[in-house]
């Protein structure tokens, strides 16, 4: 006789402290183990494997949630238009961030020092089919070598990694 337990709908978790036994029974049923007298050790081992598998499956989701919360708290600190003493939802943070980025872009485009600079010289015209030797480009991997490491303050690192 196989042990079968009701399966929770996907996307819903059991309340904390619940579901461990259900998970073990469901795991036993899925793996074809029986609950005979000699199967106690097999049941315990299967339950341990299933709990470890469930914990490993939840870890990436937990880490992603942790990273997202950390990013929102950084945005809350960095964007000056977000009221510091008021509880602001994640949905309310995003319009503040978008407005702040647009303000920064406008400030850069209208900055007097940038307006006074002469435009860069036009490239020389070359006959069709010929192309001058261009200077070698820096590979993107060299450009993306952890610039945040030099800028981040202590406590700004992503929590889960």
From Swiss-Prot:
It is found in: Nucleus. Residues 52-104 form the bHLH domain. Residues 116-161 are annotated as: Disordered. Keywords: Nucleus, Repressor, Transcription, Transcription regulation. Residues 117-126 have a biased composition (Pro residues). InterPro entries: bHLH_dom (IPR011598), DNA-bd_prot-inh (IPR026052), HLH_DNA-bd_sf (IPR036638). PROSITE patterns: BHLH. GO terms for molecular function: protein dimerization activity; transcription corepressor activity. Its main location: nucleus. Gene3D superfamilies: Helix-loop-helix DNA-binding domain. One of its GO terms (cellular component) is cytoplasm. One of its GO terms (biological process) is negative regulation of transcription by RNA polymerase II. SMART domains: HLH. Transcriptional regulator (lacking a basic DNA binding domain) which negatively regulates the basic helix-loop-helix (bHLH) transcription factors by forming heterodimers and inhibiting their DNA binding and transcriptional activity. Implicated in regulating a variety of cellular processes, including cellular growth, senescence, differentiation, apoptosis, angiogenesis, and neoplastic transformation. Heterodimer with other HLH proteins. This is DNA-binding protein inhibitor ID-4. It comes from Sus scrofa.
